[in-house]
Each structure stands twice: as structure tokens, then as C-alpha cells.
Amino acid sequence: MSLPITRTTEDVTTTVDLRRHPAYHDTDTVEAVLALLEQTLDELTGQWRALSSAVVPRPDVLHTDSVLALVRDFAAAPGKLLRPRMAHWGWVAAGGLDHGGGHHDVVRLGAALELLHCFALVHDDVMDASDTRRGRPSVHALARAEHRELGGLGDPQRYAENIAILVGDLLHSEADLLVGALPFRLRVAWRTMTIELMMGQGRDLVGAANGRRDLQHAYEVARTKSGAYTVWRPLQLGALAAGAGDELLEVLQEYGHHAGQAFALRDDILGVVGDPAHTGKPVGDDLLAGKPTVLLALAEQRFSPARRLELRRMGREPVTAAQVAELCDELRRSGVIDEVEQLIARSVVSAERALTSPLVDRRAAEGLRALVARLAWRES
């Protein structure tokens, strides 16, 4: 993301220099999370090697050590660390900076959230048959290439997907291991978050298979699949670690709902017309998958009958790159992209309004304002 950024809402244009905001002062927590991630991966590596010490891998033959290598490679290159940052600011919102209690738990939560996110990305790429992630080959694409290079038997794609499933499972297992040492209240909230995440992914898959294009379903997928698990649930976990009460949690949930919606709607735009140089994904990825997004639900309402027919072919039959590009252009011409941009702007305003509550620590309010801007106007 370029800094500073200029953003426009319905009635005001402001410039936000993220470098001047305290959200860039969560350094201690983020560094501790990264250190714990490294420690966790080192401990996993030690246990893996101890269990497989009797087997010496040959460089010219496929070997189960590739699962461990893929886990380490993927988890050791974290992205924006949004979820650990949200947990940090939830902790600050509940007075964590003043009493200092629960910070160790926030660090464990941050590392667990990042491992869970890695799990979700690896499995999501399998489900979406996506060969790229963060501008690099996805886990199953790497496994497929290795299968072919070393002359493995059977279907390379099926092998690669199976390896990616194992990689994701191991990442999830390590996340749960970290959470297992946390207080019961946090473990219950963690369980709720993971159930909600799986439910959202299931709605995404079923909605695509059913050709769902209604707004109600699209908003529900956005809320449960990405919005809640990116913003509200990490905020909740961090606040609980600092001993937050129900009234503050209600305020943070209000912020989380709107900020999470802004995040999910930006995902909608990036998944269709995002710059591949920033997103690491091909143009029109969500179109080709026929995903039940808010953007495509609005396109159903705005497009002509002929264009709607073309849109519905996506995910059902082969299409050319030129057809995808034409539909992306139509999303702009019809005003759908602009409409989603306005929805994002309104979501940001609503999120910022929630932070005016006197229950929220002033420092957390400033940090969360900066983060919602980062979520809403990011380029990847």
C-alpha cells in the first residue's frame, strides 16, 4: 500500500498518513508474535525430525519432509499480520496498556491467528484451484511441480491437493496447540471463531455451486468467511485477554462488523479488478470461480439481460481471457464498482463512529481508525 493515502467518502475527502498513526506503534506485540511463530516452527521441525529420524530422504525421490518444508516456507513469510494487530488493539481497548495483564496471551493469540490464517489460505487455494498466492506459487502448485519434476506416479494435481491438505491441517494443529495453553474464556471464543470461519467457507462453496447471486447471501458469506475472522473475532480475543466486559465488547463488535464489511467488500473488488502486481492473483479470479460476492450480486441487478447471461456462464463453462476482461470493464461502466466503493466508504464512517464511545481507550480508538483505513483502501 502506498503511503500516505487519500480516501473519499460521500461528503468528505481526507488524507490519511498511516505512518503517523499509532497503529504503527504495535511493534512490540508484532515482534513478539513473529518470534513465537519462529519458535513454534522450530519446535515443530524438531519433533518432526525426531519422529522421522530413521528415514533418510533422497534428493531425487518424493518424500514426506516436503510437507514440513511447505509449512515452514508458507508460515515463515507472513503477510500484513492484520489479525494479530487487531488482537493487540482489542487488548489496548480494554485497558491492557494500563494494567499490562494478558499481554502474553495476546502474543500467543497473535501467533495462533496467523497460523490459522495460513491454514485457511492453503485450503482456500485448493478449493478455488488457485495456483498463486501473495505473488508466488500456491502450496499445491509447488507440490504439483515437485511431483512432475521427480517423476511421481499418479495424477500430479490430486497428489498436490492432498499434500496441501496435510500442510493446512498441520498449520491448524499448531494454531490449536498455542491456544490450548490459554484461559478457558479465550479457548471458547477461539472455538466460536473457527466454527464461524468454516461455516463461512461452506456458504461460499455451496453458494457458488447453487449459483447464488442474492445480496443477503453475499453479505452473510462476507461477514462469516472474512469479515468476522479478520476483525471482530481477533478484537474480541484481544479484549477478553485484557478482561473486557460485555458493554465494551458490544462496542467493539459494532466496529468489527463495519470494518469487517469494508475489508470483505475491498476483497470483492480486488478479486475481480485488482492489479495482479499487488494482489498476486489473476484479474477476474472471483468471476471465474462464480463466487457469491456482494459485487457480483449487485452486477446481477445492474447488468442487462445479455450481460447477466454472460456473468452466469462464469464458473459453469470455459471462457476466454477477453470475455473476462470485457465483464470487468462492464462492472466499471455499469457503476457497480463505484457502488461498492461507496459501500466501503460508508462502512468506514460507521466503524469510526463506533470508536467515539467513551468505553474505548483513546489510544485504541486512534489505532483502530488507522487500521480500518488500511483494510478499506488496501491494494492487496
Model-derived segments and their meaning:
Residues 133-168, 211-228, 250, 276-302, ...:
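Divalent-cation-assisted or electrostatically stabilized phosphate/pyrophosphate-binding catalytic cores
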Residues 106-134, 193-198, 228, 232, ...:
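Active-site alpha-helical segments that house and flank conserved acidic catalytic motifs
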Residues 306-314:
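Gly/Pro-rich interdomain helix-loop hinge
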